[in-house]
């Protein structure tokens, strides 16, 4: 998407990679929600606030969510390549924490 100039789509996909990683972790605790806010709140309360994951991940989630909402819902929002690249980098960082967690818990 970056190569094709589809920066809004890149922001969307970066967010959803984070969101579904959160859902995977939450599922291990038997939790899911039909609302994004519920999924994120459960993760923050049960994993970030308890120190399982660093607080930095909450910031990554918030930035990704805000970017995705702008990209998806604001008619005149123009996403930049730089913004998309930064969001993809944050999503990769987030994924690395999730991967380590899953490996440490013998899921991967």
Residue ranges and their predicted role:
Residues 1-108:
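Terminal alpha-helical segments
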């Amino acid at each position: 998407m970056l190569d094709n100039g589809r920066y809004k789509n890149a922001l969307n996909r970066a967010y959803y990679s984070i969101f579904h990683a959160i859902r995977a972790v939450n599922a291990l605790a038997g939790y899911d929600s039909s609302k994004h806010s519920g999924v994120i709140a459960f993760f923050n309360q049960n994993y970030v606030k308890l120190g399982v994951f660093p607080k930095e991940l909450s910031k990554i989630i918030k930035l990704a969510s805000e970017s995705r909402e702008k990209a998806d819902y604001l008619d005149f929002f123009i996403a930049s390549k730089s913004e998309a690249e930064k969001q993809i980098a944050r999503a990769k960082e987030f994924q690395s924490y999730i991967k380590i967690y899953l490996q440490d818990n013998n899921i991967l």
